[in-house]
Every structure is written in structure tokens, then in C-alpha cells.
Amino acid sequence: MIKILGIESSCDDTAVSIITENREILSNIIISQNTEHAVFGGVVPEIAARSHLSHLDKALKNVLKESNTKLTDISTIAATSGPGLIGGVIVGSMFARSLSSALKKPFIAINHLEGHALTARLTDNIPYPYLLLLASGGHCQFVAVLGLGKYKILGSTIDDAVGEAFDKVAKMLNLAFPGGPEIEKRAKLGDPHKYKFPKPIINSGNCNMSFSGLKTAVRTLIMTLKEINDTVINDIAASFQFTIGEILSSKVQDAIRAYEQITNNFDKKNIVIAGGVAANKYLQKILSSCAKTYGYRLIYPPIHLCTDNAAMIAYAGLERYNNKLFTPLNFCPKARWSLEDISN
């Protein structure tokens, strides 16, 4: 049986997973660093890298035990090798390459964004091509996923990522870290029409997005309010989340038009939303309705595979393993690595 070991360390989650050739997840361990970074209100790269160094060995032992797998049973080792916080990326990549060398097993360098992009093929086995909205704390872009290693970026944020906007607004409201889930929780209790926020470049006619102005508008509002109580916090969270939904819905329409100009597979109308923001139930509902209007089906991974995880890295490794796309051990990890720059 083919077993793929996946390692993820691009930000603040240390993750190790083992999957089979049949897309079965035997084990998927994630060691969160939220407690270590919460006091700073955000991820500290140096702390993250050191934590990966101390957690990876433990995570590997746990995943082997949970999956009843021996290291010698592993067929290949896939590890995030960019983009991301370079300290953590180097730690995970070096760990994987050391295992590869010691076990004499192939190594596969995985682009972290490709891991997110292919998650829906792991969970739903959808065919190529499909339209992807990659929405996380570090990235926000629409991508035409045409095949393995074949990606066309249709548009992206020109400033902040949508996940970063969630986290920063949560910090303004003194909510816990990470902020995205806290905003969603508070938004359920608030009035989404209480405050009207701007929707930057919503009528630009292209797939690019902007969230910096929205973030600034929230900060300006908070500074003008005399009192910030729970009701106000709930209303701001709801109004902010509503505005994000309006922006993304509008841009999905632009992305569909751009996507249909470059693909003729009109019988396979799938839109995938991946990345941490894909876990937001409100956005799932809004974007699902928008997709349905245009005859598309919105697909999003289960919540534990929306955020950073190693199962998606292992699956990307499986697709590359099946195509014999291995990586030399002297591969240099990258802090920046566009999906369009991936080579097969």
C-alpha cells in the first residue's frame, strides 16, 4: 500500500499526516501554537520556527502510532517548502529531507497554496478544471485550477488578505486570537446592517480585491464611538462580516466570467473555497447561494481541513508521486512562491 507522509510548518501550526493511495487519512496531527502567540496578538515568526523545531518529532511519533505505520512503510515524504514564514518553512523542509535521506525515500517539495488548492480533490474527488477562491490569513486570490501544476491566477488582493482583515478587526475589538472564529461567533449576535462599511474596488470589473480600506473604516468607527460594549462589538462584527460577504460575492461573479473565458468545460461547474476563511459558515452560505445563481456548485473542505494541515500536503504529494514528480534534496525553500511558478 502506498502511504504518503505530509509535513506542514508554513505558519504557526505544526502538522504531520499520513494518507493512503485511496485518499484515506490514516492520521492527521496538528499541534497549535495559539497559546504561545496569543499574548502578542499575532504570530511571531521566530517563536513559530522554534516551536516547529520542538514539536515536529513529537507530531511524527504520534502520527505513526495513530496510523499503525512504521517509518519504513512510508512511500514518499512531502513537505511544505514555501510560501510562508521562512523560518518555519526551513524547519519543516529540512526535517522532511533528513527523513528522506535516512530512509532512502523520495522527497517532494509542496507549494503550500497547492495544498489548499487540491484539498477538494482529497475530500470530494472533484475533476479538473475548477475555479478556486483561496482565502486565508496570508493569501486571497481567485485561481483557475486547470490540472496538477497548472494554475492561472485570475485576480488577488492588492493589499491585505481577507483572513488578515478578520484577525486585525478582531484585535481592534479586543477579541481572542485567532480572530476569524471570534468575529464569526460575535457576528451571530449582532445586526449586520447596523454600520455601513465601504466595499473597495467592488465595481472594478476584474477579479482583484482590496480589504485595507474596510479595515481602516472599522478602526475609524471604533475611534469615534464613546462606548464599546458587547452589543457594539457584536454589531461591528456582524456588519464587517456582512461587508466581506458582499465583496466576495461580487468578485465571485467577476471570477466566473474570467474563468469561463479560459475553459470550455461548462459541464463541470465547481467553485472551491479553501484556506482558513473557508471555515466561516456565514461565508459558505452566502457564496454557495451566489454560485448556485450561476449554475455552479460551491465546495468547501470540512473545517479541520480548511485551516493549515498536513493531510492536504500529503495529498498534493500523492498526486505528484503518482506522476513521478520528485524533488532533489538540494531544493531551496521559498518565502514567496506563486502558484503560477510551480513546475512539474
Swiss-Prot record:
Binds 1 Fe(2+) ion per subunit. Fe cation binds at residues 112, 116, 308. PROSITE patterns: GLYCOPROTEASE. PANTHER family: TRNA N6-ADENOSINE THREONYLCARBAMOYLTRANSFERASE, TRNA N6-ADENOSINE THREONYLCARBAMOYLTRANSFERASE, MITOCHONDRIAL. It is found in: Cytoplasm. Its cofactor is Fe(2+). Keywords: Acyltransferase, Cytoplasm, Iron, Metal-binding, Transferase, tRNA processing. GO terms for cellular component: cytoplasm. Its EC number is 2.3.1.234. GO terms for biological process: tRNA threonylcarbamoyladenosine modification. The gene is tsaD. Required for the formation of a threonylcarbamoyl group on adenosine at position 37 (t(6)A37) in tRNAs that read codons beginning with adenine. Is involved in the transfer of the threonylcarbamoyl moiety of threonylcarbamoyl-AMP (TC-AMP) to the N6 group of A37, together with TsaE and TsaB. TsaD likely plays a direct catalytic role in this reaction. Its main location: cytoplasm. Pfam families: TsaD. One of its GO terms (molecular function) is iron ion binding. Substrate binds at residues 134-138, 167, 180, 280. This is tRNA N6-adenosine threonylcarbamoyltransferase. It catalyses: L-threonylcarbamoyladenylate + adenosine(37) in tRNA = N(6)-L-threonylcarbamoyladenosine(37) in tRNA + AMP + H(+).
